[in-house]
Design a protein with these regions (language model features):
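Strongly charged, low-complexity linkers/loops
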Residues: 223, 233-235, 239-241
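Ferredoxin-type iron-sulfur electron-transfer modules and their immediate structural context
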Residues: 2-227, 231, 254-256, 260-263
Length: 263
């Protein structure tokens, strides 16, 4: 191969490279997606757990919504107040303080308090177990199945199954709501962090059925409802419920509960 051919090939390759470079540069400018600097800053301030507890598809979705003014600056339940304040500063807003929430499991039917109707040896998954006739092996068809689907769903390790019932570590809980969505028995709810009074039962069975299934289940006697000075507790469908916005944690309901299910 002579020197002329080598030079020609080199020039051709250089020309092709230059053309591609110019083409990509022009295309990059033409099709460039504008980046919202505030959105980027908000995204960097978020913890990055992508838990979905905010109601958006991950931290990117929440950051975009906050930047557009479609979500509150304190919309991240994981970051809480500290992250909310940082994002508020980025957006030039004042953060509206909200009460911290944590998950709570409304069941006290431990292995000692309830019994199994039969020995279950299948897949240990609450959602699958809930489809079995009778709603599971436990004598109470409303209670915690104890297989830990909520434990697996929690990205923060805030839930454990203790003696057959799921228990939440309120200090580790970030109120992302994944356990709430995962429980097939709908036993888990988000409650105020400062709340200290709870009805540890979700059964809607009548009194006799409850006493035969669980040693501590609510029998719907309404003694707690009558004792509450604030009208914060009501019995609906044979089970007591607390309105946390009215409850002062006075303990009057605890004192009169014959089943000691209010703690």
């Amino acid at each position: 191969m002579n020197i002329g051919a080598i030079i020609a090939a080199t020039v051709l390759v250089a020309a092709v490279g230059l053309f591609i470079g110019v083409f990509l540069g022009v295309a990059g400018k033409k099709f460039a997606v504008e980046v919202d600097e505030k959105e980027v800053a908000v995204r960097e301030a978020l913890p990055g757990n992508n838990c979905g507890g905010c109601g958006y598809p991950g931290c990117d979705g929440l950051a975009a919504a906050i930047a557009k003014g479609e979500a509150p600056v304190n919309g991240c339940p994981v970051g809480g107040e500290p992250v909310g304040k940082v994002i508020a500063a980025i957006m030039g807003q004042e953060v509206v303080e909200t009460a911290r929430q944590v998950a709570y499991v409304k069941c006290a039917g431990t292995c000692e308090k309830t019994k199994d109707n039969y020995e279950y040896t299948g897949v240990e998954d609450c959602e699958m177990m809930a489809f079995i006739p009778g709603g599971g092996a436990k004598s109470c068809t409303y209670g915690c199945l104890g297989f830990g689907s909520c434990v697996k769903a929690c990205p923060f390790g805030a839930i454990d199954v203790v003696n057959g019932v799921a228990v939440v570590d309120k200090e580790a809980c970030k109120a992302c709501g994944k356990c709430v969505a995962k429980c097939p028995k709908h036993l888990i709810e988000l409650v105020p962090y400062e709340q200290t009074t709870f009805v540890q039962c979700s059964s809607h069975a009548k009194g006799k059925a409850v006493t035969s299934a669980c040693e501590v289940g609510c029998i719907g006697c309404k003694k707690c409802e009558k004792a509450c000075p604030n009208g914060a507790i009501t019995v609906d469908n044979f089970c007591a419920h607390i309105d946390y916005s009215k409850c002062t944690n006075c303990g009057a309901c605890k004192e009169v509960c014959p089943r000691h299910i209010i703690q």
